């Protein structure tokens, strides 16, 4: 069995995540992270020698949770609800790790070690997303023409991965509210909407939801 994680290390990561989301990756210094965790900088350096090391540890946390949310074995059956739950779960997760998305440009410049990790994770998540589309098609919930499948996949990945940075850059949003999550889910539902089958639309009509994946 592996060595159990240090409680202090986990407390530092918990505090760092809150601070990074609130202040941004650029403004959150190691001194502020240590203060938020209730320790001095010397103790922080015992666990994380650099701010980049904190970023990497939080990315590892996110990766574990993201891959658990989108497992290789996807929901069976012909109901839309499990896929809607995946959608809501994804946006809740990205809100919790907001700094990774909102501050992506700074992170890749300031923490070069993140770049290959982010690329690998992005590729893995793209394949999981491809599997979601395939499962929805097999369940008779969507029908996507072969010629449009890769374009839909790319647009789903762009919206699901960059919605927070769009809000930050275009609208100056730094702190996300439930309304922002609802907006982001709506953008993704709009991409699915043209491809929903009669079966899926009937399920939405029964719940009073508009076309798209029900929130």
Regions found by a protein language model. Give the residues of each.
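Hydrophobic/aromatic residues within well-ordered alpha-helical segments
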Residues: 51, 58, 62, 66, ...
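Short hydrophobic clusters on alpha-helical segments that form packing/core surfaces
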Residues: 12-20, 66, 90
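Hydrophobic alpha-helical connector segments
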Residues: 71-99, 153
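N-terminal positioning helix adjacent to the helix-turn-helix/winged-helix DNA-binding module
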Residues: 8-15, 152
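C-terminal peripheral helix-coil segments that are non-catalytic and often amphipathic
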Residues: 131, 165-215
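Amphipathic alpha-helical packing segments from all-alpha helical-bundle domains
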Residues: 113-139, 150-165, 182-194
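Secondary-structure edge/capping motif, primarily at the C-terminal ends of alpha-helices
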Residues: 70-74, 101-108, 136, 140, ...
């Amino acid at each position: 069995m592996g060595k159990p994680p240090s409680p202090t290390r986990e407390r530092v990561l918990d505090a760092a995540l809150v601070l990074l989301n609130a202040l941004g990756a650029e403004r959150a210094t190691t001194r502020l992270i240590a203060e938020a965790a209730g320790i001095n900088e010397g103790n922080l350096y015992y666990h994380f020698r650099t701010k980049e090391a904190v970023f990497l540890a939080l990315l590892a946390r996110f990766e574990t949770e993201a891959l658990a949310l989108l497992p290789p074995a996807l929901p069976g059956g012909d109901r839309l609800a499990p896929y809607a739950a995946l959608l809501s779960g994804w946006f809740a997760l990205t809100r919790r790790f907001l700094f990774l998305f909102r501050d992506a440009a700074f992170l890749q410049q300031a923490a070069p070690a993140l770049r290959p990790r982010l690329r690998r994770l992005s590729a893995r998540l793209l394949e999981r997303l491809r599997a979601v589309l395939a499962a929805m098609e097999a369940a008779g919930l969507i029908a996507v023409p072969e010629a449009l499948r890769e374009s839909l996949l790319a647009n789903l990945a762009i919206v699901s991965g960059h919605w927070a940075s769009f809000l930050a850059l275009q609208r100056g949003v730094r702190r996300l509210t439930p309304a922002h999550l609802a907006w982001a889910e709506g953008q993704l539902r709009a991409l699915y909407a043209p491809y929903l089958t009669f079966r899926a639309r009937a399920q939405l009509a029964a719940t009073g939801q508009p076309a798209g994946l029900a929130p």
